[in-house]
Amino acid sequence: MVLISKRTLLRASAAAAAWGAAGAARAQEIPPHERALHEAARREGELTWYTGQYNAETSEAVGRAFTERYPGVRVNVVRSTSQVAFQRLSQDNRAGVPQCDVFASTDFGHYSLLKRENRLLQYRPENDAQLIPALRGSDPDGYYHTSFMGLYLMAYNTTKVSEAEAPKKWTDVLEPRWRDQLAVGHPGFSGAVGIWAVQMRKMYGWDYFTRLERNRPQIGRSSMDPVTGLNAGERSVGIAVPSATTLLSAQRGNPLRIIYPEEGVLATLSPQAIPRNAPHPNAAKLFMEYTATTAFSTVIRTLFNDPINPAVDPPPGSRPMSEVKLIYPTQAEAERGVPEVRELWRDTFGI
């Protein structure tokens, strides 16, 4: 996972205005380089996308939209947490039966490892130039490219907690009054939760999690699992939840409200890559091109995800980036820290 600064996102917002209506028109066009890839991809007929980035509903919507834009190429969506996606990819490799054409994880360490082991196909999407400027060229060598931008914060069930009572800071959830009322994902499964744990340890030390454990949080797998628990009324406050999933759930009538912690919101970027042994490499290349287009960002925005193409406005209900304080570990801190916090988490929470 790559981290992004507030200054970068503000520049992106300014760039969006410059694209204007012309960008929307371009979304309906298929340029020559995509048409050539489409012809080759049609002969392959399909691609398989291992993804731990967008939720299942968004991922399926992306798959359908891709096939509508490029008829004759089906997307097999395999949605899981990022760690499970990586385990599945590794198992395929050990078995000598490649299944994955595009691998998308929220754990940046996966890409560093795969690149070192020469397990990625080098490909530089021409459409990468359409991305928010700061998102271009994730890897100077061209082995992986940005496909996801997310904000992780807190949320609460409005039927169980009033606005006045709701936590305002990441540290507020450590108060004893929140015992048996909290929900959080697991860094052993979710790359985003792993990054959040690294950042909390950086800010407060591991004592933050020792104190959190005393409040007996409900621990799921994905960063999205707490939202399900809040909707069901099982818990009152979700920690390190994605803004997109929470806003979408609230828009559908669930009693949820997001919290922008005073210390800052975790801001992250994640890339995707083509395995070197991908069975449908042309379809995979076409998919890499697609995820940089306005067409892709338009689809994900309808489900409240943050667009990565500057021609598409942010989702409704989210704060302007100028009003959001962002926090994040460095890439080096994240790569080194995620494996460490996984082990510490198991020792502390016993799971």
Q: What kind of feature is each model-predicted range?
A:
Residues 2, 8-27:
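N-terminal export signals
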Residues 109-113, 236-255:
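A ligand-binding cleft/hinge motif common to bilobed small-molecule-binding domains
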Residues 50-63, 75-90, 98-234:
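Extracytoplasmic ligand-binding site segments that recognize negatively charged/polar headgroups
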Residues 150, 178-188, 210-213, 219-220, 252-278, 290-314, ...:
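Periplasmic-binding protein-like
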Residues 120-129, 142-145, 171, 248-266, ...:
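Short beta-strand->loop
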Residues 153-160, 197-198, 268-280, 299-300:
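A bilobed periplasmic-binding-protein/Venus flytrap-type ligand-binding module shared by bacterial periplasmic
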Residues 31-42, 47-48, 52-72, 154:
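Short, polar/charged alpha-helical segment
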